[in-house]
């Protein structure tokens, strides 16, 4: 089961928490859910260069609080905070309510699964060899304290006629262990030969306390567990296009 399910969804309520944190009546739930999706799509499109890891949306009474976790917060804030104020006004138009905007810096983007996946996808679009991009990402993650990392790249890799999936792993990535702090992220690369998918799993150590906010608190404080290497594995599997 752990091999197939989304590692974040499997650990919700154990050591991970939701990115949308609010309650709503039955009649309003669908409207607010679509509003969240619209906000996230808009931010990902407008702030593509800011390397956004995730967007957390909270809704106190008749208000909306949006927290953007990004590796380059300066690009969001702008000169003297001009850009962030424009962004806040745009979000107020979308939500039609008082909106507060917070920016949180991702201190170690090399061990953030979403940012690693985005980086590899951008390299594939620039025609950098996928093996080199994967290996470089793995080495950076292990050097900065990850206990294990696995990367999957699938599609017409290197312009091959038959699509396939290749993976690279270093250290350990225990997908079945619920107390394991496993970060997961995906990205798509729009290459000349079609779309290539990138999946990344990063194991940052174990969280022994039963606390849904533990993983986020650890990431915010920059206290990712430091771990050793482990054996290096590479694998390759062909799949039909």
From Swiss-Prot:
Keyword Nucleus found: no
Region Disordered: start-end pairs: 214-241
Record domain KH type-2: where: 39-107
Superkingdom, taxonomy of origin: Bacteria
GO biological process: translation
Gene Ontology CC entries for this record: cytosolic small ribosomal subunit
Entry-linked InterPro entries: KH_dom, KH_dom-like_a/b, KH_dom_type_2, KH_sf_prok-type, Ribosomal_S3_C_sf, Ribosomal_uS3_bac-typ, Ribosomal_uS3_C, Ribosomal_uS3_CS
Gene Ontology molecular-function annotations: mRNA binding; rRNA binding; structural constituent of ribosome
Cysteine disulfide links: none
Pfam families linked to this entry: KH_2 (PF07650), Ribosomal_S3_C (PF00189)
Protein keywords: Ribonucleoprotein, Ribosomal protein, RNA-binding, rRNA-binding
Gene3D superfamilies: 3.30.300.20, Ribosomal protein S3, C-terminal domain
Protein's UniProt keywords contain Ribosomal protein: yes
Function: Binds the lower part of the 30S subunit head. Binds mRNA in the 70S ribosome, positioning it for translation.
The family this protein is said to belong to: Belongs to the universal ribosomal protein uS3 family.
Protein name per its UniProtKB record: Small ribosomal subunit protein uS3
Species: Mesorhizobium japonicum (strain LMG 29417 / CECT 9101 / MAFF 303099)
